[in-house]
């Protein structure tokens, strides 16, 4: 099963229509979204021109994202989106969980595995303290990350200070189709990696933009 929880700092649409987790009008997607989409009004206008406007429940950028995902698909919508965000998106139809981080990583997103032995739980959150609060969290400090911190005074992505917990890198999309892997990989995953039912890819790359 999949569980999404959200504690919202309301910026756009303070009404109950902006509450999260939020389901798309067609029921395919459920989202927990931290951040802001600066061009969401332009995206709404584009959806209107395409005849793909649902019955809007409010005026939140979250609802705009969901409408885009239903009409254009996940990666095509992300390519149109200007903003800062960390997204957890559950595709009900395809039984796929997507985790997304904005182009420059303005909003953090952590993921990893909690528990011991077989049957570890895959978890994710905007902050490490959210993961530390989970029942069964006993992940030790990662020695490699500690060494990096002592050298650079920061833990570079994709590692976090905890073993088995990683930072989703900027511009990346992590997808899990079906059951999640039940144990952390031996080494941090890099973009283009496939690990059992998990795939990690870049939906945006500065190098690609410069080359274009």
Model-derived segments and their meaning:
Residues 1-212:
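Cysteine-centered catalytic environments shared across enzyme families
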């Amino acid at each position: 099963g999949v569980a999404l929880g959200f504690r919202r700092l309301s910026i756009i649409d303070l009404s109950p229509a902006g509450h999260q987790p939020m389901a798309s009008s067609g029921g395919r997607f459920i989202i927990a979204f931290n951040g802001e989409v600066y061009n969401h009004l332009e995206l709404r206008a584009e959806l209107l021109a395409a005849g793909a406007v649902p019955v809007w429940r409010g005026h939140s950028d979250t609802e705009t994202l969901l409408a885009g995902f239903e009409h254009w698909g996940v990666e095509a919508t992300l390519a149109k989106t200007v903003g800062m965000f960390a997204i957890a998106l559950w595709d009900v139809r395809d039984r796929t969980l997507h985790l997304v981080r904005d182009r420059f990583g303005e909003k953090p997103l952590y993921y990893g595995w909690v528990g011991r032995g077989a049957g570890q739980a895959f978890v994710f959150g905007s902050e490490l303290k959210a993961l530390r609060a989970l029942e069964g969290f006993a992940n030790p400090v990662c020695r490699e990350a500690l060494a990096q911190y002592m050298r650079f005074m920061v833990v570079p992505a994709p590692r976090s200070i905890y073993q088995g917990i990683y930072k989703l890198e900027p511009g990346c999309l992590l997808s899990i189709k079906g059951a999640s892997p039940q144990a952390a990989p031996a080494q941090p995953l890099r973009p283009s990696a496939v690990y059992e039912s998990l795939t990690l890819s870049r939906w945006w790359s500065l190098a690609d933009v410069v080359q274009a």
